[in-house]
């Protein structure tokens, strides 16, 4: 019986990860064929592509009111992204860093971790606080895509906070929607009746089928992966927070691991590191935010006093390593990996 449950757990993870991969590819292809702008593709697909497993599993856990799995997944994924993934990538090849990684994305990543810690102090992430996280994520994406020219390249943390509290992202969203609506109207006037058939050619129908199939795989995979994770947590007497922080977190971080290690090995250190930092921001602002919109998320004592402070600490260490010679060296990768191993050891003994 336990063997069957374990196989279902693994199968759910495979469906989750591979389904996410095919979902992003097919959705991106469809969007381009339909003439959707690169901005919208980036906003909806590229920005959250590697975080879809965390998103699906967290929402599935939230619906089942398994708050420990949700928070453990997000916090554990963020720790694994830095300690395990950046550590392994830096060990394979030193990664060049840039000042924007520190003063913009790095500080926003740290801000998201600290803000979650502040919200968690009453042992609950309310639906209002979750909504604020989602707004922060929307503002962050619009800030990156829309404000580069206005700030002449100076897109740092201070500018982001100003941008958010002045609600400039609302104007950006309205302008973008109006612009897309006008372009679509012009396109409709200039098109003929044969365009619909042309879209179905070149594999469009196949892309739609792949999208639907991959979406189903994500939903099914998330459902069974979370259910079996809860089963093993109860069977072994392990808190669901621990299961979420380890098994679920590492399992759903596989896309980040593959992308980051691949980029590092090919010499694209900035892409590798940008993927990790972006994923960590997405995990808290978008995934934790959306998950908290279903039900308020209760915060376990372990999450409040151990795993979340560890997440903040390892984020700080990463920022320090980013600024030392603007390169993450191999020995720094080893330090991050040792930090992660030490975290796991302490986690299972407290």
Curated annotation (Swiss-Prot):
<keyword id="KW-0739">Sodium transport</keyword>
<comment type="similarity">
    <text>Belongs to the Ca(2+):cation antiporter (CaCA) (TC 2.A.19) family.</text>
</comment>
<keyword id="KW-1133">Transmembrane helix</keyword>
<feature type="transmembrane region" description="Helical">
    <location>
        <begin position="276"/>
        <end position="296"/>
    </location>
</feature>
<dbReference type="GO" id="GO:0005886">
    <property type="term" value="C:plasma membrane"/>
</dbReference>
<dbReference type="InterPro" id="IPR004481">
    <property type="entry name" value="K/Na/Ca-exchanger"/>
</dbReference>
<feature type="transmembrane region" description="Helical">
    <location>
        <begin position="202"/>
        <end position="222"/>
    </location>
</feature>
<keyword id="KW-0109">Calcium transport</keyword>
<keyword id="KW-1003">Cell membrane</keyword>
<keyword id="KW-0472">Membrane</keyword>
<dbReference type="InterPro" id="IPR044880">
    <property type="entry name" value="NCX_ion-bd_dom_sf"/>
</dbReference>
<keyword id="KW-0915">Sodium</keyword>
<keyword id="KW-0812">Transmembrane</keyword>
<dbReference type="GO" id="GO:0070588">
    <property type="term" value="P:calcium ion transmembrane transport"/>
</dbReference>
<keyword id="KW-0406">Ion transport</keyword>
<protein>
    <recommendedName>
        <fullName>Sodium/calcium exchanger MaX1</fullName>
    </recommendedName>
</protein>
<feature type="transmembrane region" description="Helical">
    <location>
        <begin position="242"/>
        <end position="264"/>
    </location>
</feature>
<feature type="transmembrane region" description="Helical">
    <location>
        <begin position="330"/>
        <end position="350"/>
    </location>
</feature>
<keyword id="KW-0106">Calcium</keyword>
<feature type="transmembrane region" description="Helical">
    <location>
        <begin position="125"/>
        <end position="145"/>
    </location>
</feature>
<keyword id="KW-0050">Antiport</keyword>
<feature type="transmembrane region" description="Helical">
    <location>
        <begin position="101"/>
        <end position="121"/>
    </location>
</feature>
<feature type="transmembrane region" description="Helical">
    <location>
        <begin position="39"/>
        <end position="59"/>
    </location>
</feature>
<dbReference type="InterPro" id="IPR004837">
    <property type="entry name" value="NaCa_Exmemb"/>
</dbReference>
<keyword id="KW-0813">Transport</keyword>
<feature type="transmembrane region" description="Helical">
    <location>
        <begin position="4"/>
        <end position="24"/>
    </location>
</feature>
<feature type="transmembrane region" description="Helical">
    <location>
        <begin position="69"/>
        <end position="89"/>
    </location>
</feature>
<dbReference type="GO" id="GO:0008273">
    <property type="term" value="F:calcium, potassium:sodium antiporter activity"/>
</dbReference>
<comment type="function">
    <text>Catalyzes Na(+)/Ca(2+) exchange. The transport is electrogenic with a likely stoichiometry of 3 or more Na(+) for each Ca(2+). Is K(+)-independent.</text>
</comment>
<dbReference type="Pfam" id="PF01699">
    <property type="entry name" value="Na_Ca_ex"/>
</dbReference>
<feature type="transmembrane region" description="Helical">
    <location>
        <begin position="302"/>
        <end position="322"/>
    </location>
</feature>
<dbReference type="GO" id="GO:0006874">
    <property type="term" value="P:intracellular calcium ion homeostasis"/>
</dbReference>
<dbReference type="GO" id="GO:0005262">
    <property type="term" value="F:calcium channel activity"/>
</dbReference>
């Amino acid at each position: 019986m336990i063997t069957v449950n374990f196989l279902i757990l693994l199968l759910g993870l495979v469906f989750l990860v591979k389904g996410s991969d095919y979902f992003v590819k097919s959705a991106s292809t469809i969007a381009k064929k339909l003439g959707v702008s690169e901005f919208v593709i980036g906003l909806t697909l590229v920005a959250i592509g590697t975080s879809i497993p965390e998103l699906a599993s967290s929402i599935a856990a939230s619906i089942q009111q398994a708050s420990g799995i949700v928070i453990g997944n997000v916090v554990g994924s963020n720790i694994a992204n830095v300690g395990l993934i950046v550590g392994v990538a830096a060990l394979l090849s030193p990664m060049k860093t840039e000042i924007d990684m520190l003063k913009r994305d790095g500080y926003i990543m740290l801000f998201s971790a600290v803000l979650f810690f502040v919200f968690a102090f009453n042992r609950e992430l309310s639906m209002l606080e979750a909504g604020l996280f989602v707004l922060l994520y929307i503002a962050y994406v619009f800030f990156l895509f829309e404000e580069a020219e206005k700030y002449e390249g100076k897109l740092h943390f201070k500018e982001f906070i100003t941008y958010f509290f002045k609600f400039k992202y609302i104007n950006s969203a309205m302008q973008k929607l109006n612009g897309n609506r006008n372009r679509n109207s012009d396109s409709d006037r200039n098109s003929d009746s044969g365009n619909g058939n042309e879209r179905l050619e070149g594999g469009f129908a196949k892309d739609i089928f792949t999208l639907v199939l991959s979406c189903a795989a994500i939903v099914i995979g998330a459902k069974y992966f979370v259910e079996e994770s809860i089963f093993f947590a109860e069977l072994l007497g392990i808190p669901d927070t621990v299961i979420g922080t380890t098994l679920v977190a590492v399992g759903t971080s596989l896309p980040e691991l593959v992308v980051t290690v691949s980029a590092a090995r090919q010499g694209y250190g900035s892409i590798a590191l940008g993927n990790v930092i972006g994923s960590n921001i997405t995990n808290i602002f978008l995934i934790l935010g959306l998950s908290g919109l279903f039900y308020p998320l209760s915060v376990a004592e372990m999450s409040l006093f151990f795993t979340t402070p560890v997440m903040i600490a390892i984020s700080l260490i990463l920022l320090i390593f980013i600024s030392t010679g603007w390169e993450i060296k191999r020995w720094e990768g080893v330090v991050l990996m040792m930090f992660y191993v030490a975290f796991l050891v302490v986690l299972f003994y407290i």
